[in-house]
């Protein structure tokens, strides 16, 4: 066994492997739990919908800005992952209204949330959908059963296998698209 440690991160490990290092045990410590690339996580609350007093519906709300990246997506939303049926790889993630339904046998048009003139047509029958959001709490009660550590590991391995190689590379990776449904695009 050949081990390496001391301030290892993904870039150094990738470089050592590219140089042909025969290391088979990696001691990643500090850089496993910290992020040099993004040491702070910025989070801001933005109102997206208000529940109507008279019924169960949500009234969509939007924050407008001259900077298109700061314009919010209005409404009560959910997110689906779109997989390519032939390869099982991720085509895009789709933000849509919570009560939207989709027919996988029909064409779907999805819109870039920032550069809204960019749209993609996905041919019906070539994709499958999986909703990503699951309820954790409902009416103040926990309704979620957490998977075991080994189940979480298996889920991570399965999901990593759905990424294209181009999105997994460290240098200049392709992005996984996160787009809007046609309905959400038109509401926005």
Where do the language-model regions lie?
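Short beta-strand/loop segments at the ligand-binding rim of alpha/beta enzyme cores
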Residues: 1-4, 23
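Gly/Ser/Thr/Ala-enriched C-terminal appendages of enzymes
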Residues: 8-188
């Amino acid at each position: 066994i050949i081990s390496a440690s001391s301030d290892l991160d993904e870039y150094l490990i990738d470089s050592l492997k590219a140089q042909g290092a025969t290391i088979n045990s990696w001691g990643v410590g500090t850089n496993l739990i910290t992020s040099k690339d993004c040491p702070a996580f910025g989070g801001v609350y933005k109102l997206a919908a208000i529940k109507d007093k008279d019924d169960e519906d949500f009234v969509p709300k939007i924050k407008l800005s001259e900077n298109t990246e700061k314009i919010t997506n209005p409404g009560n939303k959910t997110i689906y992952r779109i997989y390519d049926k032939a390869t099982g790889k991720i085509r895009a993630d789709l933000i849509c209204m919570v009560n939207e339904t989709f027919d996988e046998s029909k064409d779907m048009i999805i819109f870039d949330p920032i550069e809204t003139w960019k749209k993609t047509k996905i041919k019906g029958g070539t994709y499958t959908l999986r909703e990503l959001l699951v309820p954790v709490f409902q009416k103040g009660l926990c309704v979620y059963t957490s998977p075991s550590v080994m189940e979480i590991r298996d889920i991570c391995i399965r999901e990593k296998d759905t990424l294209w190689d181009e999105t997994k590379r460290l240098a200049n990776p392709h992005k996984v698209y996160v787009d809007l449904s046609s309905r959400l695009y038109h509401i926005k």
